[in-house]
Amino acid sequence: MPRYALKVEYLGTPFAGWQRQKDLPSVQGAIETALARLEPGPHTIAAAGRTDAGVHGLGQVAHCDLTRDWDPFRLSEALNYHLKPQPVAITAAARVAEDWHARFSATERQYLFRLLMRRAPATHDAGLVWQVGHRLDARAMQAAADLLLGRHDFTTFRSSICQAASPVKTLDELRVEAVESFSGPEIRFHVRARSFLHNQVRSFVGTLERVGAGAWAPEDVRSALEARDRAACGPVCPPQGLYLARVGYPEPVFAADRSAAS
């Protein structure tokens, strides 16, 4: 059966997460329902990452197997038609090898987290940022973030229900960026690794916020990491503000990615 990769963008607010759940709205369920309107189902799609409730997607990648030989552009157009009015869009589609897998073929995942610093309630960015009413020291946060780079046992920074076989991961990037947006001053976190533990990024951000607020010193983050104890973690920040921004593969999958790489 022909296999297709889909690049997916979605607003996570109305969904119970990516993964299909009985009697609850999910991004996976929305796409599988749209696929069933193109070809008889049932259809099951696999994704590079299963984002939690309220987490958004800018560059999620999934794959599906279809019986018909679709032109990728027409496939994306047809899916987008049937996905309306839900806040889910297929921004690209590509034919891939039958053994290509959205999750297992991926070599890296990149997340973005937006933290807005202002006292007035966010209106246009409501649900798209984590908002705090105080300023944060981005330099101190970066100093603490640097201590987390590399290969470590991240037991402190994973949820108690994490199903990963090992807490050891390699963190390739954790960059703290101060940005002046139209809504106000933001801190943006750029986080990149081959794979992540459950709630790892939100645990990082919640802990680093404490550093930026002056409640923790950067060295306290090192102590928390070395404790290998969930109780040593700072607060876990809320899901709004977190985006799965990009998934990387050994070779570019979509036409726009191939053009950028050449």
Curated annotation (Swiss-Prot):
- Assigned keywords, A-Z: Isomerase, tRNA processing
Family, similarity comment? Belongs to the tRNA pseudouridine synthase TruA family.
**UniProt keyword annotation of Isomerase present:** yes
Which SUPFAM superfamilies did the record assign?
Pseudouridine synthase
In terms of InterPro entries, this protein maps to:
PsdUridine_synth_cat_dom_sf, PsdUridine_synth_TruA, PsdUridine_synth_TruA_a/b_dom, PsdUridine_synth_TruA_C, TruA/RsuA/RluB/E/F_N
Active-site residues (renumbered): D52
GO MF assignments: RNA binding; tRNA pseudouridine(38-40) synthase activity
What reaction does this catalyse? uridine(38/39/40) in tRNA = pseudouridine(38/39/40) in tRNA
Assembly, in brief, is:
Homodimer.
| The protein, known as | tRNA pseudouridine synthase A
Origin organism of this chain? Ruegeria pomeroyi (strain ATCC 700808 / DSM 15171 / DSS-3) (Silicibacter pomeroyi)
Q: Does the keyword field hold tRNA processing?
A: yes
Q: Which PANTHER family match?
A: PSEUDOURIDYLATE SYNTHASE, TRNA PSEUDOURIDINE SYNTHASE-LIKE 1
Q: What processes in GO biological process is this protein linked to?
A: tRNA pseudouridine synthesis
Q: According to its UniProt entry, what is the function of this protein?
A: Formation of pseudouridine at positions 38, 39 and 40 in the anticodon stem and loop of transfer RNAs.
Superkingdom, taxonomy of origin: Bacteria
